[in-house]
Structure formats: C-alpha cells, structure tokens
Amino acid sequence: MDLLAKILASDPTTPRLTMYDENSGARLDFSGITLDNWAAKVANMLIEELDLAEDSLISIDLPPGWQAVAVALGALAADIPVTLFDAATSDVAFIAENDAQDAAENAVESEASGSGEYSGDVVIVTNDPFGRGVEETGGTLLPGAIDFGPTVRFYGDQFAQPTRSLADIVADVLPQSLHRFSPTSRVLVQGWSNWLDFVAKVLAPLAAGGSVVIATGDPDRLTPERLDRIVDIEKVSERLP
C-alpha cells in the first residue's frame, strides 16, 4: 500500500502519531507501520463490511484522536471521499458514542423507520483510548448501529488494492501545505474544524514524512502549562492553532 510509503521507507518504527488524552491519562504512540495497518483494516472494512465505493461519502463525526485519524487514512486508502461533521449527507457516519449519542440515535431511527433524511450506516466509536468497542466497555450498542472496535479488528492489516500516496492526495487538496513541513517536523494540534483543517494539521505533516502529536482534554487538565510540558517532552517543532 503506497499511502504511507514515504514514512515506511524512511523509518517505519518511529512514532508518527502520538495521542495525549488528559481526561483518561493515556498516552499512545503509533508508528508508521501501525498507522499503515490501521489504514488497511479500515479500508477493508469500508469496502467489505459497508460496501462502499469511490462514489460513496463517509462523515467522520469524531473528537480529535487517533481513531479519527485511522478512519480518515483508511478512507483515503480506499479512495472514498471524506467529510467531517456532516453525517446527514454521508453514506456512512462515524459517530462518537458519548459526544454525539443523540445524533447517532436519530440517524439510526431515521434509517429504521424511513421517516428521516438519513439512510446510511452508523458506526459508533467509543472514546476508549485503546479502541475497545461499545459493548466491550460496558455500553449498549444502539439497534442498527455498527460497533467500530470489534468490527474493524476482524479485517486484515493488508490492503490489496492500489492506493495513492498521501503526498499526492494532500497536493490535490492543499498543495501549499506540503512545503510547510519536512521530515523533521513534529507538530502539536488540539483539534480541527473541517476537512481542509484536518488535511493542513494532520495529513500534511505526515505526507512530508513528519509526525503529529494530538493533545485533548478538559481545560482544567490540559492547561497552558501542561501543553508547554508536552511540547518539551515530545520535542515539538511547531504548535498549530
């Protein structure tokens, strides 16, 4: 799979995505190999489980975190267009269990009854830092919804179809962003507002061969002092607003 070929060719074991969840206290590292494996699993799930194609659209309605990145990379590997925070227009909506429970329930009910506009699949993603599913963390899965954690793990970590490189994909969307980063870039982000913002903050540094640190948490936990500490610990080269 060529999506992350630049990273895999240079140093496949170096952390390329680091996740700080200050609410849970979790810190997770994802190497190029690990990201590639997750992208393949998601791509296989999108095609085999959800029967999506190039003319489909998925919406990632998830808080900042590694699972949002994994879903995005998988969609790009499968050449399936992505939007953020716009479930109503999508064929499949990836929705956070806690942050968007009402939206998920409405979408599932619309699909079941045929009374609403939404007719796609709903995939529920927990906020568990290790990617466990709804039922695995003691929750109850909404009728008609798909539990992301146990479902995606079923699929292989190799994707057989041809893929474009992440650099080519970013160049089509935000060509100027590629020149901003280098293989030594290690950027800190706290979130994104839309797809272009996600491309600029997360995909562009990865496409350049760099790495990304995502830090999330309540303001009383993720204080300016804590962010400064993360910058020092992770040797961050740039903080993106």
Name these PLM-found stretches.
Residues 45-81, 85-87, 182-204:
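Conserved AMP-binding/adenylate-forming
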Residues 60-61, 68, 72-102, 109, ...:
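Short beta-strand->loop structural element characteristic of the AMP-binding/adenylate-forming
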Residues 10-11, 51-54, 84-91, 115-119, ...:
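Flexible, charged surface loops at secondary-structure boundaries
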Residues 2, 40, 69, 199-200, ...:
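Residue-level marker for well-ordered alpha-helical positions
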Residues 1-18:
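A short N-terminal helical cap/helix-turn-helix that marks the beginning
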Residues 174-184, 194-240:
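Conserved AMP-binding/adenylation subdomain of ANL enzymes
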